[in-house]
């Protein structure tokens, strides 16, 4: 009979049960909240508290990746990282540090908006209800957050400062010579003072207001661009590259995504490519995460090469040049044609009205004119995903645009094609095709019967087509033009080619990035409005700070206009654009009342999470987004060369590129502009693993309730029906969700916390086993029984010394636990506490000198029962700020040492000698122990390895 099923009379009145755990936990949670136990004092301002027990102490800022409050609430996998950081933060408070640990909510985004569209319920209503549910669930777990610092990105007093940060970025430009952002006003001063040339060389005073504005806007870190974007008709919005899956579909909804040229807000994150890459070396992050960011940034060294063009009968003025970037400029002698992305800006300029004489029919796409060929091909290409366009296995397609370019090193006229395997968003959107050294170019050349020139000597025995390896340059000389690469290795050939290009004005050495500028606008409702209006000329104007926040207005229809998922030619229509009384506004921006039009896009969900860690530091400040002194105290650099940032940031590895890269970019801009002292937001990153679960399917493949499945002899059954077991994530659709609420009801929050922390290393994924939770419950019951008499409720703790063996065990455990806690090895900590508890329960009475350290070491994991036991042992204040136990070094030294004794390589005995015994004493004891094995023989050699073993050679 289980305890839960046993008659109440059979259970001792003061036994630790789920009901008692619930009463204890709720009482202590109320106490902590009432007394502000986990409030962390700031150095100054309204959150300062000079009387706090940790005022002036060494600080520690522990941060969780804050959750999106979904309607489903938490399952047991979600709190794993939150419990881990709570255990770490609780330990650090007891170790003497002033710990800031807060929790907020990343609450804007598409799920709430989609739910609003389906139900008509305002997204704020559902989101606030979800936040309330999350708060209740997290509170039930006993998480020690400073609730005064909680924020939600949907609150106007929070997104006011999100808008303010956007304006700092908008009103800044990146000075590549200084390698930092500077205010736009300083750029204008350089233009007007003549120290910086305008793009066309005219004096600043000769430019019209519109021309000046255009020049300045080209430098802004936040700017509007008519650019190729990921348009998703099925969602009715554009998406960032990072929100598109590898197969070219939307991450949310799985709709097809198309490349379209649309007017959108962008952020010039590419300006920070080098710093984002180089500063990874200063971060204490997992190496796989750093590698993912390095690959995403994708720095490449090579050259930009300019190819002059000629376009008979086209509308082109002069000779437009096509710029390509290549990592192998040394292969330019093999460039026999150019390929542009169908969306490339120069295509329309270069297309003539008629085909040149002698154009092969295969090049024309069967069309009567270049313009018809280009239009037809573009339509087909727009319907393909990026993955489909770049598939290695597909047959190469394309059309000749009717114009030629000049290869600068050979002088040869080479045809210009458009083809879908070149993407506008990567590089310059144009490539020089070298079929001899590139497999895709070779395949294209074969389809269109284009020349193939090898410029690298293939390895001996090579019988393939394109040779992509290294080798000496061949067919790479035009002496009359002053360039001869034949016989050179790749590195020298590249260097010589770049020098020749730069000397002749044909190109230059360059570094490029896979990283693209960040698409920052969304055609949605549920997001931060932009603090931007447009005047009668369509010029963007930043609103002054005193007009912030620009609040999100009420609307009748929350949905952006969506389209047939395959309608690539559709155009965005935003929900805010339908609130004309909000869109069209009269404002006085310093030159009298005028009519303006508001920006009707909203910011992406990532905006609030780019800076929320700063608002936790000073959440009530109405004058600044964060007080500089608070930022320096909690996030400032520790010394010369230190990057600063949070001391610990815990979250899932799935955010390796998106959130982490965007947040680093925003933080660096704020650092450049003098708003923060740290140049990285997160000094140390820790990725927790995932809690996964078994799911079960019947013969139809339908999921069945996991809790109703039983195992019999290694086979799984639902009733009498055999089912299949699979392992993976936990989810409602898989019918295997277990919630923290269920576990707290069955065992208490402390048991749930101990179980999650004991399942394995925090960074490793692990399977959830509901049946195993009872083991953690029984452990806490043993701790309780060691200290509390289950019949009377009286304390069993006595003020008598522990025996020597128990005392030495205690200090060994304390020493090990401290090391484990610092390294976040929580599972091994709990194993040590179980070992100590088992030893304690074998004693006839419980010595205080063992019980109190045990409870203090247990407190980070099971804080409620630890507080209760601490109080029952006679303490009147919370153990939150009690000193964590420290081991006595003298008790860590063993009194005796056990030596295995080998004879001719086999262990024949063991001896125990005093720890300070000399070698002769050890030798004599060893020989005595194996005398029978020696059978009277005199050993030839006796080797004593101090503290480890004795080896006897007979």
Curated annotation (Swiss-Prot):
Chain span(s) of sequence motif 'HIGH' region: 67-78
Pfam families: Anticodon_1, tRNA-synt_1_2, tRNA-synt_1g
Broad class of where this protein is predominantly found: cytoplasm
Assigned GO CC terms: cytosol
Subcellular locations according to the entry: Cytoplasm
EC number from the UniProt entry: 6.1.1.4
PROSITE patterns per UniProt: AA_TRNA_LIGASE_I
Keyword Nucleotide-binding in record: yes
A molecular-function term among this protein's GO annotations: leucine-tRNA ligase activity
Keywords: Aminoacyl-tRNA synthetase, ATP-binding, Cytoplasm, Ligase, Nucleotide-binding, Protein biosynthesis
Substrates-to-products reaction catalysed: tRNA(Leu) + L-leucine + ATP = L-leucyl-tRNA(Leu) + AMP + diphosphate
Class of the enzyme per the UniProt entry, highest EC level: ligase
GO biological process, one term: leucyl-tRNA aminoacylation
Placement of sequence motif 'KMSKS' region: 729-733
Positions bound to ATP: 732
Family, as annotated: Belongs to the class-I aminoacyl-tRNA synthetase family.
HAMAP family: Leu_tRNA_synth_B
NCBIfam families found in the cross-reference section: leuS_bact (TIGR00396)
Protein name: Leucine--tRNA ligase
Gene: leuS
């Amino acid at each position: 009979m289980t305890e839960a099923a046993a008659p109440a009379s059979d259970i001792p009145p003061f036994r630790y049960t789920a009901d008692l755990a619930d009463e204890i936990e709720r009482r202590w949670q109320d106490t902590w909240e009432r007394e502000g136990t986990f409030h962390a004092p700031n150095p100054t301002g309204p959150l300062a508290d000079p009387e706090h027990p940790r005022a002036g102490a060494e600080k520690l800022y522990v941060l969780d990746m804050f959750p999106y409050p979904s309607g489903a609430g938490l399952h047991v996998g979600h709190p794993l990282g939150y419990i881990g950081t709570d255990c770490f933060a609780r330990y650090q408070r007891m170790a003497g540090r002033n710990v800031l640990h807060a929790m907020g909510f990343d609450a804007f985004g598409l799920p709430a908006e989609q739910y609003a569209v389906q139900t008509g319920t305002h997204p704020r209503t559902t989101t606030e209800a979800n936040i309330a549910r999350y708060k209740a669930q997290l509170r039930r777990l006993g998480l020690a957050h400073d609730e005064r610092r909680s924020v939600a990105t949907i609150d106007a007093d929070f997104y006011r400062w999100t808008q303010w940060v956007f304006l700092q970025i908008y009103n800044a430009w990146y000075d590549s010579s200084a390698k930092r952002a500077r205010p736009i006003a300083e750029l204008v001063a350089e233009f007007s003072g003549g120290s910086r040339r305008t793009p066309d060389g005219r004096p600043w005073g000769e430019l019209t207001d519109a021309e000046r504005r255009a020049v300045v806007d080209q430098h802004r870190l936040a700017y509007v661009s008519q650019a190729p974007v990921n348009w998703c008709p099925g969602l009715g919005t554009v998406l960032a590259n990072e929100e598109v899956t590898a197969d070219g579909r939307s991450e949310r909804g799985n709709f097809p995504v198309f490349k379209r040229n649309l007017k959108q807000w962008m952020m010039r994150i590419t300006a920070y490519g080098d710093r984002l890459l180089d500063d990874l070396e200063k971060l204490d992050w997992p190496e796989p995460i750093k590698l993912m960011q390095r690959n995403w940034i994708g720095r490449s060294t090579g050259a930009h090469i300019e190819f002059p063009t000629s376009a008979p009968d086209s509308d082109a003025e002069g000779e437009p040049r096509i710029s390509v970037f290549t990592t192998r400029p040394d292969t330019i002698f093999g460039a026999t044609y150019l390929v542009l992305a169908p969306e490339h800006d120069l295509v329309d300029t270069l297309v003539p009205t008629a085909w040149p004489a002698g154009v092969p029919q295969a090049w024309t796409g069967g069309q009567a004119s270049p313009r018809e060929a280009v239009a037809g091909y573009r339509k087909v290409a727009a319907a393909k995903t990026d993955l489909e366009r770049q598939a290695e296995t597909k047959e190469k397609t394309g059309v000749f645009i009717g114009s030629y370019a000049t290869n600068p090193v050979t002088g040869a006229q080479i045809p210009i094609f458009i083809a879908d395997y070149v993407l506008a968003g990567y590089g310059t959107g144009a490539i020089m095709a070298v079929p001899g050294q590139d497999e895709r170019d070779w395949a294209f050349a074969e389809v269109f019967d284009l020349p193939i020139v090898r410029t690298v000597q293939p390895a001996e025995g090579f019988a393939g087509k394109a040779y992509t390896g290294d080798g000496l340059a061949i067919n790479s000389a035009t002496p009359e033009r002053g360039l001869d690469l034949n016989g050179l290795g790749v590195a020298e050939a590249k260097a010589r080619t770049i020098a020749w290009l730069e000397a002749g004005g044909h190109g230059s050495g360059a570094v490029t990035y896979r990283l693209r500028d960040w698409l920052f606008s969304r055609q949605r409702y549920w997001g931060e409005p932009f603090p931007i209006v447009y005047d009668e000329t369509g010029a963007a104007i930043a609103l002054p700070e005193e007009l912030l926040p620009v609040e999100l207005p009420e609307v009748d229809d929350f949905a952006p206009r969506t389209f047939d998922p395959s309608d690539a030619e559709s155009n965005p229509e935003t929900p805010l654009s339908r609130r004309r009384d909000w869109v069209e506004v009269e404002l006085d921006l310093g030159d009298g009342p005028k009519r303006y039009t508001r920006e009707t896009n909203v910011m992406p969900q990532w905006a609030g999470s780019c800076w929320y860690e700063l608002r936790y530091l000073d959440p009530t400040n109405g004058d600044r987004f964060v007080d500089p002194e608070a930022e320096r105290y909690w996030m400032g650099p520790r010394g010369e060369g230190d990057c600063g940032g949070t001391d610990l940031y815990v979250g899932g590895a799935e955010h390796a590129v998106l959130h982490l890269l965007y947040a680093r970019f925003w933080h660096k801009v704020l650092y450049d502009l003098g708003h923060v002292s740290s140049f990285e937001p997160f000094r140390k990153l820790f990725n927790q693993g995932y809690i996964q679960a078994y799911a079960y399917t019947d013969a139809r493949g339908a999921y069945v309730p996991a809790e109703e499945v039983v195992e019999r002899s290694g086979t799984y059954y639902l009733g009498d029906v055999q089912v299949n077991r699979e392992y993976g994530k936990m989810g409602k659709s898989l019918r295997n969700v277990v919630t923290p609420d269920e576990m707290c009801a069955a065992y208490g929050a402390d048991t749930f916390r101990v179980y999650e922390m004991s399942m394995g290393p925090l960074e490793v994924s692990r399977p959830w086993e509901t049946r195993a939770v009872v083991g953690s419950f029984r452990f806490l019951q043993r701790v309780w029984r060691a200290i509390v008499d289950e019949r009377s409720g009286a304390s069993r703790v006595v003020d008598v010394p522990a025996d020597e063996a128990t005392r030495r065990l205690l200090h060994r455990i304390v020493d090990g636990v401290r090391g484990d806690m610092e390294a976040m090895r929580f599972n091994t900590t709990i194993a040590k506490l179980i070992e100590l508890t088992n030893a304690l329960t074998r004693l006839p009475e419980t010595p205080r000198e063992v019980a109190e350290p045990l409870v203090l070491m247990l407190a980070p994991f099971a804080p409620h029962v630890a507080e209760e036991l601490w109080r029952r042992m006679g303490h009147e204040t919370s153990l939150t700020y009690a000193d964590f136990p420290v081991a006595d070094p003298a008790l860590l030294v063993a009194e005796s040492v056990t030596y295995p004794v080998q004879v001719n390589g086999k262990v024949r005995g063991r001896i125990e000698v005093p720890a300070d015994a000399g070698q002769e004493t050890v030798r004599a004891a060893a020989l005595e122990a194996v005398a029978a094995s020696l059978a009277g023989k005199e050993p030839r050699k006796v080797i004593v390895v101090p503290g480890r073993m004795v080896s006897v050679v007979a």
